[in-house]
Amino acid sequence: MRPASAEITITRMTEHDLLEVVEIEEESGLSRWGWAAYYAEMQGTNRDLMLIARVAKAPIIEHQRLAGYIVARESAGELHINNVAVRDQFRRRGIGIALLGSIIETAKRLKVQVAFLEVRRGNNAAQELYKKVGFKPIARRADYYSDPREDAVVMSLTLGEQ
């Protein structure tokens, strides 16, 4: 993968990244996948759609080397973005956009026509991030999330004609 900017590097996630990925997942309050689910996903055909971001010149705090990650699946010409997360101290530095841009580039190489994701209805910051990349809200899923219970906004992005 190419660097997204001079200081952000996006690469494929490896097994060695999983403990930190789970840590970022917990910090971000995402629905819990856990180590085993990420590992199982990595063994399948979608491993090229599991990316991590590192920031050059970032202070390494204990074992923290990753700034964020994204996990998606491709099926029947569609991309489903499952998780996007960036550590608090790296937010608003373009990492989310870099991760989304890299996954979209990969999806286009795979001849994916459309990308979908769900986001918590109350997560306005994430919705704005997705809109910056071109996603549009298309539907709502009632009570999609638990702990706490919340509706999801379904967003899509057409890739095939871009």
Q: What are the residue ranges of the model-derived segments?
A:
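Positions that flank functional sites
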Residues: 40, 122, 145
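Accessory recognition modules or surfaces
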Residues: 97, 150-158
